């Protein structure tokens, strides 16, 4: 049995790997898939992750999902014109929902995701100094899955994703 490293060592190691990988010629989709995979690995409680991109003319695009679920959740947000991923992409830096069963910010979206089995989530704006690219979105099948440490790690991953997106445009 090997030594277990403290979580921040894992974070530092994974971020270094992501940075090196991003330096290689790769598509944005590949970089974002690396980021969502890293989120699954580094942020306890994450059952699925994806990225919602804002395209030209404000069109949204769901990419880099670790399952089909993030795209379904993004589609519900488009349908209802409300939800945490859209809010993070457009307005807030971090949007955390501890329990969708008691979440009243999104009257249509919240009950729809509970029906699917998603009970908590956290979304991070992907932005640089002058432009917004979208949101990194993490979801869990358990309530209260995310905490301040989840947010810290997510912000770092989101910054990496944003840099990769903007470098490619």
Where does each model-flagged region fall?
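Regulatory sensory and allosteric helical modules in signal-transduction proteins
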Residues: 52-54, 62, 70-107, 111-119
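Short beta-strand-to-loop transition segments that serve as allosteric relay/switch motifs
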Residues: 135-144
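Allosteric cytosolic regulatory segments
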Residues: 155-162
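Helix-loop-beta substructure at the N-terminus of cytosolic sensory domains
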Residues: 4-63, 72-74, 82
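Short hydrophobic beta-strand micro-motif common in sensory/regulatory domains
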Residues: 120-126
């Amino acid at each position: 049995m090997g030594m277990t490293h403290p979580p921040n060592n894992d974070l530092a190691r994974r971020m270094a790997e992501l940075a090196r990988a991003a330096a290689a010629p790769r598509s944005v989709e590949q970089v974002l898939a690396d980021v969502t995979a890293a989120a699954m690995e580094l942020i306890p409680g994450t059952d699925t992750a994806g990225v919602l991109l804002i395209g030209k003319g404000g069109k949204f695009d769901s990419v880099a999902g670790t399952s089909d679920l993030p795209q379904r959740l993004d589609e519900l947000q488009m349908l209802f014109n409300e939800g945490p991923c859209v809010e993070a992409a457009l307005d807030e830096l971090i949007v955390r929902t501890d329990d969708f069963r008691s979440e009243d910010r999104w009257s249509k979206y919240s009950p729809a995701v509970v029906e699917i089995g998603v009970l908590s989530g956290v979304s991070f704006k992907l932005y640089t100094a002058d432009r917004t690219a979208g949101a990194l979105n993490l979801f869990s099948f358990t309530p209260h899955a995310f905490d301040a440490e989840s947010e810290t790690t997510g912000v770092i991953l989101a910054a990496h994703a944003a840099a990769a997106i903007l470098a490619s445009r």
